[in-house]
């Protein structure tokens, strides 16, 4: 348990090439990671996981997804071997009841919208990382309510996502 509550961070990842680069963005991400209290887990809401429904990754070892094309081979070799946490996934699902979220044990993982930033914020990749999908068919109000239901987790889970 951390000593002070964590708030959500809204971080646009920009180019996946930021994973390999040192620039003003990646330096700020590293500084953020050094300044944050250590969370129990990280939950990222990723626009790259855009489905008809809401799901949270619930595997112990989420795969790293290279969901892009046209970049150098070195980027496709990038890895962020963070663990997952089915237990934290269940806590998230419980917070979103009734009926908001399903557990995803094997169809997704950690996409570049998450790992390209976390490679700098938490470079050791030793914190459980979970992703929450974006419900492509739900109205704006649904997503606001989702955020309200996630709010009580702020003292246990760092959350990240971006909305433009």
Where are these regions (language model features)?
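Conserved beta-strand elements of the Class I
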Residues: 9, 41-43, 128-130, 159-161
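Solvent-exposed alpha-helices and their adjacent loops that cap or buttress functional pockets
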Residues: 1-3, 35-36, 121-125, 152-155
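Short, well-ordered beta-to-alpha junction loops that form the rim of enzyme active sites
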Residues: 46-48, 108, 162-164
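Internal, conserved structured core segments that host functional sites
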Residues: 89-144, 149
């Amino acid at each position: 348990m951390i000593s002070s509550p964590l708030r959500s961070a809204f971080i646009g990842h920009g180019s996946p090439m930021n994973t390999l680069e040192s620039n003003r963005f990646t330096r700020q991400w590293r500084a953020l990671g050094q300044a944050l209290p250590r969370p129990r887990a990280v939950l990222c809401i990723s626009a790259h996981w855009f489905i008809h429904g809401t799901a949270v990754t619930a595997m112990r070892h989420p795969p790293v997804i290279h969901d892009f094309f046209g970049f150098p081979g070195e980027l496709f070799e990038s890895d962020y071997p963070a663990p997952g946490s089915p237990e934290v996934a269940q806590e998230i699902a419980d917070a979103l009841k009734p009926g908001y979220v399903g557990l995803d044990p094997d169809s997704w993982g950690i996409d570049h919208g998450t790992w390209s930033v976390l490679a700098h914020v938490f470079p050791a990749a030793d914190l459980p990382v979970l992703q929450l999908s974006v419900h492509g068919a739900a109205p704006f109000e649904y997503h606001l309510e989702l955020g309200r239901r996630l709010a009580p987790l702020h003292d246990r889970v760092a959350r990240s996502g971006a909305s433009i």
